[in-house]
Amino acid sequence: MRLAGMCAVLLCAAGLAMAQESDASIQGKIIALEKLWNQAYKSADTKALDSILDDSIVLINDDGSIQTKKEFLASVKASNAQEQQVAPEALKVNVHGNVAIASGVLRVKGVEGGKPYTRRERFVDTWLHKGENWVCIATNATPIH
């Protein structure tokens, strides 16, 4: 009986150690996906964006409007804005099992209609481990003035 109890304790401890390593690994994956999203957005790469956004994603823009994935991809494709920089100033990832929350501040610089612009926004992206991949299921951006 003692042997079974000791084995159970050791298995739980091993599981906790694996979970901690797993969280760090997941955080790295989510950071890489956030970088991919920023680069794809900057270069209007709708194929790359399509691969990381869940079909049911809810996108809440910095003006409060809501878009579906289809609407978002169409707006990226049709935009006449030329993003010169899309870079996080701060990024934090919290892992909760098969869900990861990425939050931070994003700085965007570009030109639209011949006029330069700079904006900063606080964002929260919710990522879900679905099958073999992580996909974003919700995103919210709030302007920082």
Listing of model-derived features with the role each one plays in the protein:
Residues 4-15:
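Bacterial N-terminal signal peptides
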Residues 20-52, 56-145:
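A beta-strand edge to alpha-helix "cap/lid" segment located at domain peripheries
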